[in-house]
């Protein structure tokens, strides 16, 4: 290799090739817009959908994982789908194709907007005063907000597709587009509103 072909010392190996990488070899992950500054730090978007558990066991490092992979992992957290990573990945890939076909928008942007809209700002905790449990409203940490949003989206997908003629990728596409549009009929947004309603009553 000549000196002209050698990479710069500060440049990561393969940086030029990585710049043009796309999620599922289709979707560009650059130029994503965030409407909620509190969760922007915890919604990571990368073209890598499977990191082989690189951050497993490291506290709070889940925020370094792509939000797409975190959604895939969430979809596996039912008895029927435990460990079926390829199946969950295929569901997300097909859902993204369906979202792009229906909305003509970037499905990655739709996912980010859905997570932001489904993330609850308040919830309740139980405090004991003299042996009596009293609900108390508390603010939700940004990282937990993202966790809860992914949980609601996965639960809504499972409930809409389990023992139903609706395919899982169709149910997921409906959940994401509904949440991105802040449709209160969507399971994820409905659960967020319910949590905040209960918290408001416990102030």
From Swiss-Prot:
SUPFAM superfamilies: Ribosomal protein S7 (SSF47973). Pfam families: Ribosomal_S7 (PF00177). This is Small ribosomal subunit protein uS7. Transmembrane segments: none annotated. GO terms for biological process: translation. Belongs to the universal ribosomal protein uS7 family. GO terms for cellular component: small ribosomal subunit. InterPro entries: Ribosomal_uS7, Ribosomal_uS7_arc, Ribosomal_uS7_CS, Ribosomal_uS7_dom, Ribosomal_uS7_dom_sf, Ribosomal_uS7_euk/arc. It comes from Halococcus morrhuae. Gene3D superfamilies: Ribosomal protein S7 domain. The keyword Cytoplasm does not apply. Part of the 30S ribosomal subunit. One of the primary rRNA binding proteins, it binds directly to 16S rRNA where it nucleates assembly of the head domain of the 30S subunit. Is located at the subunit interface close to the decoding center. Residues 1-22 are annotated as: Disordered. Keywords: Ribonucleoprotein, Ribosomal protein, RNA-binding, rRNA-binding. One of its GO terms (molecular function) is rRNA binding. The lineage of its organism: Archaea, Methanobacteriati, Methanobacteriota, Stenosarchaea group, Halobacteria. PROSITE patterns: RIBOSOMAL_S7. The keyword S-adenosyl-L-methionine does not apply.
């Amino acid at each position: 290799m000549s000196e002209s072909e050698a990479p710069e010392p500060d440049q990561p190996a393969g940086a030029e090739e990585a710049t043009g990488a796309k999620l599922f070899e289709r979707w560009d992950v650059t130029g994503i817009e965030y409407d909620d500054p509190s969760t922007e730090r915890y919604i990571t978007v990368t073209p890598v959908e499977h990191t082989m558990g690189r951050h497993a066991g490291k506290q709070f490092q889940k925020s370094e994982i792509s939000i797409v992979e975190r959604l895939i992992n969430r979809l596996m957290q039912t008895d029927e789908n435990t460990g079926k990573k390829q199946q969950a990945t295929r569901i997300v890939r097909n859902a993204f194709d369906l979202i792009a076909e229906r909305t003509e928008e970037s499905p990655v942007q739709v996912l980010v907007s859905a997570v932001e809209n489904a993330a609850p700002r308040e919830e309740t905790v139980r405090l004991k005063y003299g042996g009596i449990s009293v609900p108390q409203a508390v603010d939700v940490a940004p990282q937990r907000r993202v966790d809860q949003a992914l949980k609601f989206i996965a639960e809504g997908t499972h409930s809409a597709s389990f023992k139903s003629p609706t395919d899982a990728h169709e149910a997921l596409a409906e959940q994401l587009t509904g949440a991105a549009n802040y449709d209160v009929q969507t399971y994820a947004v409905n659960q967020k509103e319910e949590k905040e309603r209960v918290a408001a009553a416990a102030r």
